Amino acid sequence: MSLSTGSTGSERSNQSLIKGALDLDPWLEPFSGQLIHRQLNLRKWYDEFKQNEGSLTNFASAYEKYGLHANWDTKEVFINEYIPNVVEVSLVGDFNNWDTNTHKLKPVNDFGLWSLTIKPTENNEFAVPHDSRYKISMVTASGERIYRLCPWLKRATPSTENNLYEGRFWNPQPTETYKFKHERPRLESKDGIKIYEAHVGISTPEPKVGSYKNFTTKVLPVIHKLGYNTIQLMAVMEHAYYASFGYQVTNFFAISSRFGTPEDLKELIDEAHRLGIRVLLDVVHSHSSKNVEDGLNMFNGTDHYLFHGGTKGSHELWDSRLFNYSNYETLRFLLSNLRFYIDVFKFDGFRFDGVTSMLYKHHGLSFGFSGDYNEYFNSEWVDNDAITYLMLGHKLLDEISVRENNYKFVSIAEDVSGMPTLCLPIGQGGIGFDYRLSMAIPDMWIKIIKHLSDEEWDMGSLVHTLTNRRHGERCISYCESHDQALVGDKTIAFWLMDKEMYTNMSTLTPFTPVIDRGIALHKMIRLITFSLGGEGYLNFEGNEFGHPEWLDFPRKGNGESYAYARRQFNLIEDDLLRYKFLFAFDGAMQHLDTKYGILLSSQAYVSLKNENDKVIVFERNGLLFIFNFHPTNSYADYKIGVETPGVYQIVLNSDSLSFGGHGRIEETNKETGEKLQFFTNNERWNDRSNALFCYIPSRTAIVLQVKEKVV
């Protein structure tokens, strides 16, 4: 679609909607019409919600009305449900012996809204007891009676009789409801986002399902000690199939009951806030489980309840259902879902899963993105309804932010396509995300480690991949996430050290060549990704200390074993194992940003990519980063170009003994106690105004800071 950009007042006004995007990227000019269309489509829906519901925020508060609720003042229980294309609706459960005749809902309008209010018992108690089972029974237009779980239910638990999940009415006494004690933490202005990606169920060394309470008491202190300021919680939304890693959601407003109660999760988030850590939800709005009896699929007997009908509503690779983002009630459901997790559980933002699948009608399947802008704006390929939903979601976050004293909620997109303007504010003509995941970086590392000898590592290609991101759109860099930890793949530590991790990680035995190389490169890979790859950083739990095993959830194929569905945090507590060194280095790396503000600073200036020496040098926010990837060559008095003249000192050294290195750099004079200093001279070198000489051992990274500037 192409809209005119002539001289009328309306057209000039429309053009102003995308001025920020065009200023950043003039190559978007030919696609102005499509960008304006996105903005106008957002405005259309926004105005419609304002007219019909009072505001977007009100529209997204449907979780307070829809579903089964308790009125503590009157002791009444009420339910509202959107169920089109049925002739009868009943509430059934333990409370009425599953009788379909005693508690029938009444139609409220012609659009499919049904409602029922249940009076209290003779003892003035709720007619539906807390934590009792219930379902919605319907008679379809064809006369079939079906039973389904409420789409808005707040708790579901596995049946003791079969593998299906059962809906439960979560309505604890006020004295048993967790009360939040701590404010949402706000990051310091220079503190970049440092994300610890975690899954509650695997966050225990024991071969079992971990709990919210275990995570609160055992894992949160570890994350805090490391210096991460954000947690990304996976698999929170209820999913009947544990091995889906939480990505086949069955109940969108219920949190996973495997790990504990809703009150337990509230306590976890509140304790994280006390520690100054924000918590993001890994939200799955790209698709839904195809489960029928305990999911959303075929809820009212049709295949198009909240979803597209027919083949358009199915994801062939994921074997799941796809939402219809042009449907009014689908938007109500999904936007309310976002607000629900912010209001009820105090999540501080979202990582949106599967954004590439949402953005395109082809869902990115068998499509190789080349960077041609036509791939991002072709109306036959792009799902503009999904884009409008994502923009509405960010508009909602902005409105909630105003209500919460301008708290900045964070949004991250999992997108591999490189969609332009994805991470620009709506006010600049963008879709609204704060960050996108730099998904090319982990792929690069695996290819390098798997296919190239150390001598074949290409410094220029490495730097290009780490720095290749859209101007003005922030990225989260990472070496590996949960994807690389899954069975069938290997973590970086396992690619580097393989089976020797089981036999040669003891500090009581000498380094083997494999372990020596693995520990050194593990640190270097993480540091260069952290410092050069983006404006934020992510780590999957356990990888910070080189967790020795892959991740495999219990399933038929492994005999329902939990042996690999765990994280062995006990390894870092064993003083005789080398995992403690990797853990210590990762913590030092996080605190480096906390102290010096690396991530939020301008992109680094890379002054050297020496292929023969395998040396990379760059400056970022006043720090000088030096990497020697050569497997054997150490360099004495290596000349380094630097812009700022002065006296430099080491602030991080991967070869330090405290990080499992060899201590080849004497950072402190043993006799005087003075720190090693590097003095610049005014010789121009590698396009920098000054130079200094530095000893850089093989497979070592050092970070210098100017301690005393010279004019």
From Swiss-Prot:
Family annotation (CDD domains): AmyAc_bac_euk_BE, E_set_GBE_euk_N
Site residues, Transition state stabilizer: 483
EC number annotated for this UniProt entry: 2.4.1.18
Disulfide-bond pairs as recorded: none
Catalytic site positions: 353 (nucleophile), 414 (proton donor)
PANTHER family: 1,4-ALPHA-GLUCAN-BRANCHING ENZYME (PTHR43651:SF3)
UniProt name for this protein: 1,4-alpha-glucan-branching enzyme
Provenance organism: Debaryomyces hansenii (strain ATCC 36239 / CBS 767 / BCRC 21394 / JCM 1990 / NBRC 0083 / IGC 2968)
